[in-house]
Amino acid sequence: MTESNIKKVALVGGGVIGGGWATRCLANGLEVVLTDPRPEAQDYVETMVADAWPVLEDAGLVSENKGELHFAQDIAQAVQDADFVQENVPEREELKISVHEEISQHAREDVVIASSSSGLLPSRLQARCAHPERLMIGHPFAPVYLLPLVEIVGSEQTSQTAIAQAGAFYRSLGMRPLHVRREIEAYIADRLQESLYREALHLIDQGVATVAEIDAAVTGGPGLRWAFMGTFLAWHLGGGPGGMRHTIEQFGPALELPWSHMKAPELTDELKERIVDGCEVESGARAFDEMERRRDRCLAEIQKVLKEHWYPPEEDGWPPMATDR
């Protein structure tokens, strides 16, 4: 975890995401000032913090000194002395544009402002900002206090200095910032999730599988690998000693088969090499058999954790087959 000069964070919006940010910041000893026009927001956030705290403590994610949580009446009061601003209002573009216009009028000029938007373009949110160069997307995943990914997305107006400052701050919170290289709607992770979701809807609509069976297909197979390897490294290791090159040669032609409802890109030689090279860089100097051992240990430990903390007693969480009903 890196150090940060940010000591006071303003949160605009206190729903699931805003409350999650508050919890993570408090666990890292920061002062948090939150504003939300809803009268129930304060109780909601305080309850989220209290409920999450034992889990964070058991996981060793709480600093020695718990941060302080304050509630402000409006945006101006919340952001005026903040070192960092994270906006978490509902995903409506015009609302966010208006909120960021107000934030930019009251926050210090040197303060980075991030939006938790899950799909909007930062260039659109900058439309009425006094200092658009400091505004970007900082898209987390719920529960924010546990999941480390945060996608940082800037526009042509966003300064690289501001992006670097945001990345350093998120790292100081124990998160894993991912800088999206180009401004694009829905960024990276949600696009991947959406692709899987669309295909799952097709399978349900065609009567191929139930919701539980589709979830089981993910959690019992690729999902366990994805938790620590991702898509490409899993395929790289699945190709045996030949790695991704062997996987592409063996399964590449299957991309042309009409199995899914998403059109795949043409698998050109250039694209093949980019994928292979990327996998080899990611796996680094680790030997193939070493990676296999590490993968197997991770898979075993993940399943132990799921069995102990997720599934009900005497159940394994797997849906019954049709012949068992």
Residue ranges of model-derived segments:
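Helix N-cap / loop-to-helix initiation motif
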Residues: R38, H131, S159, A209-E213
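NAD(P)-dependent Rossmann-like dehydrogenase/reductase catalytic/cofactor-binding core
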Residues: T2-N5, N28, M175, Q206, ...
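Active-site-proximal catalytic alpha-helix in oxidoreductases
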Residues: V144-V153, L173, L178-V208, A216-L233, ...
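Rossmann-fold dinucleotide-binding core
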Residues: S115-R182, A186, D190
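Hydrophobic/aromatic residues located in beta-strands of well-ordered beta-sheets
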Residues: V32, V85, I113-A114, L135
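NAD(P)+-binding Rossmann beta1-loop-alpha1 motif at the extreme N-terminus of oxidoreductases
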Residues: M1-V55
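Rossmann-like NAD(P)-binding element
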Residues: P37-E40, V55-V112
